[in-house]
Amino acid sequence: FRNLRRKEILYAAILLHDIAKPRGVADHEITGVDMSRIILNRLGMDDAVADVGFLVRNHLVMEQTAFRRNVHDPDTLKEFAARFPRPELLDYLYVLTYADLSALNAGVWTEWKSAMLQELFQRTSEILLRNLRGTEIDDYHHEKHEETAESVVDALSASLPRAEVERHIRGM
């Protein structure tokens, strides 16, 4: 939150992300984009319309991806990362998603949800900041997997024979 450059974008998105919900409209996030544009223009926040519109339109996507898809699957990450024209928008969406979910009631926000959301955020952030595309994401994912496997082998080799640990890890 502290690193967000324009907090007014986040505040506007928090206030407007469900603006079309009371109308009982299916796909309230789509209708909400038009409604938020009108409101922001009236408030003289023309320069925030595109970013707030993006956040309103996508405010359900991060939680749906984090909780219903495999955040370790490169295809999931490619699809999710492709939505973001700029890495900064991921930062805003992450905070908006957290605020939206944690505001519902105490039972909705769990450690598991927190972990899944953070995992999706971190993996996607790396992709966006490194400007990875297509097979570069696959290569990066494979490289990270190898690094993790190597660190597990190193840690377990302190108490077990290294060859046995490597054989087990490589067989997974």
List each model region and its residues.
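Acidic/His-rich, divalent-metal-binding segments that scaffold phosphate/diphosphate chemistry
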Residues: 1-28, 38-47
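Feature representing long, continuous alpha-helical segments
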Residues: 10-17, 30-34, 38, 50, ...
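Generic structural signal for hydrophobic core residues of well-folded globular domains
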Residues: 13-19, 23, 59-60, 96-102, ...
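Flexible loop/turn segments at secondary-structure boundaries
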Residues: 20-23, 30-32, 42, 61-65, ...
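A glycine- and charged-residue-rich anion-binding loop/surface
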Residues: 22-30, 47, 51, 56, ...
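Short secondary-structure boundary/capping segments
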Residues: 28-31, 69-74, 110-114
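Acidic/histidine-rich catalytic neighborhood
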Residues: 41-98
